[in-house]
């Protein structure tokens, strides 16, 4: 992946075999387009993921391993979206960022980026263990194991993100990678390959396998509620694929551009424009994570109802009771048969409900 975000002060791209290519119009469009969408993604992602954090930390029920992973997914998304205002400032301010802020913003961005992808992958593996290998995984799906695995995931995210930010510095009003001469040609390629493989292809393969096996297991279960669970599974995989594939294709094409596969100026301009558009689509995935992974669960709906009641009480100046217990309990009774087929072997009753 090119150093994020794209340079907004460089109006020309140069090539040893081609004339200077003017991309000033694309840069101006990218500045306006990305600034607006970064602000929108920041606002929505901040609210959604904070709700997940508040719901999990304020819940009086005992924590489960699923809760641990969902909490860390929300934290990684928050770390990711927290950098977007700084990138917006970088886009619209000619002076860019201070050197220290450039380093920290880039580091937090990529740690949150890879952390979010890794925790989504871990959640798919956890669901595979809870449903497909329920009897064998009972002793391994504890809160203590969840905390240990989460710490390992954060360590892996930092390790994988390091090549993306270790050479970053503020140089001539741009937050860019300043590589040693011996690494100037190979390092950008390695970064792109790492992002494509560890940030997309490998997680997608793991998710696809885990959810395929889960669907196979659900099909063997005689229950009319399995259709809803299967739809949620397909939604998780399809949304991940649709939101991240275009962006990763553009990263791959950017890698090819480093080897002069696109000498035409028009093609380079099209690539730059496409990268800006697909970038916003991919980054907005962090806004959907709370909806897909958290708010589908009963405890999160209960917390939202509780929060809604508190807001009404503040607005109305008196206590307001929101009655949702009957509808929730009825829904819980209807869905209990499917859950019991798998979770009686596990330590986490939410394993199937949070598909």
From Swiss-Prot:
Family named by the database record: Belongs to the G-protein coupled receptor 1 family.
One GO CC annotation: perinuclear region of cytoplasm
Topological domains annotated Extracellular: 1-31, 91-103, 168-195, 257-273
Organism of provenance: Homo sapiens
Spans through the membrane: 32-59, 70-90, 104-125, 143-167, 196-215, 232-256, 274-297
Role of this protein: Receptor for the C-X3-C chemokine fractalkine (CX3CL1) present on many early leukocyte cells; CX3CR1-CX3CL1 signaling exerts distinct functions in different tissue compartments, such as immune response, inflammation, cell adhesion and chemotaxis. CX3CR1-CX3CL1 signaling mediates cell migratory functions. Responsible for the recruitment of natural killer (NK) cells to inflamed tissues. Acts as a regulator of inflammation process leading to atherogenesis by mediating macrophage and monocyte recruitment to inflamed atherosclerotic plaques, promoting cell survival.
Protein name as catalogued: CX3C chemokine receptor 1
Classification of source organism: Eukaryota, Metazoa, Chordata, Craniata, Vertebrata
Encoding gene per record: CX3CR1
KW DNA damage (keyword) present: no
């Amino acid at each position: 992946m090119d150093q994020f975000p794209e340079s907004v002060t460089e109006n020309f791209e140069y090539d040893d075999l081609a004339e200077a290519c003017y991309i000033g119009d694309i840069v101006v469009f990218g500045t306006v387009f990305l600034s607006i969408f970064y602000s929108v993604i920041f606002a929505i992602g901040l609210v959604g993921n904070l709700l997940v954090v508040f719901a999990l930390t304020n819940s009086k029920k005992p924590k489960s391993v699923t809760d641990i992973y969902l909490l860390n997914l929300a934290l990684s998304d928050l770390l990711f979206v927290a950098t977007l205002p700084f990138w917006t400032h970088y886009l619209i301010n000619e002076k860019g960022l201070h050197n220290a802020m450039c380093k920290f913003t880039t580091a937090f961005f990529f740690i949150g980026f890879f952390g979010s992808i890794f925790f989504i992958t871990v959640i798919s593996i956890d669901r595979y263990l809870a449903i497909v290998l329920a009897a064998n995984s009972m002793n391994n799906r504890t809160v203590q194991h969840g905390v240990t695995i989460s710490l390992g995931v954060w360590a892996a995210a930092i390790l994988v993100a390091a090549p993306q930010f270790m050479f970053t510095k503020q140089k001539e009003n741009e937050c860019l990678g300043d590589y040693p001469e011996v690494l100037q040609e190979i390092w950008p390629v390695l970064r792109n390959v790492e992002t494509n493989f560890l940030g997309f292809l490998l997680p997608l393969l793991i998710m696809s396998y885990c959810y395929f096996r889960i669907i196979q297991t659900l099909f063997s279960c005689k229950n009319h509620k399995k259709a809803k669970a299967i739809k949620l599974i397909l939604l998780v995989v399809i949304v991940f694929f649709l939101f991240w594939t275009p962006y990763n294709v553009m990263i791959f094409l950017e890698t090819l551009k480093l080897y002069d596969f696109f000498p035409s100026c028009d093609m380079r301009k099209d690539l730059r424009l496409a990268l800006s558009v697909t970038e916003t689509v991919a980054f907005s995935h962090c806004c959907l994570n709370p909806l897909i992974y958290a708010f589908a669960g009963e405890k999160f709906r209960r917390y939202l109802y509780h929060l809604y009641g508190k807001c009404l009480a503040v607005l109305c100046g008196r206590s307001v009771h929101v009655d949702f217990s009957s509808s929730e309990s009825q829904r819980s009774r209807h869905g209990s048969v499917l859950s019991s087929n798998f979770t009686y072997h596990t330590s986490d009753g939410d394993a199937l409900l949070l598909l």
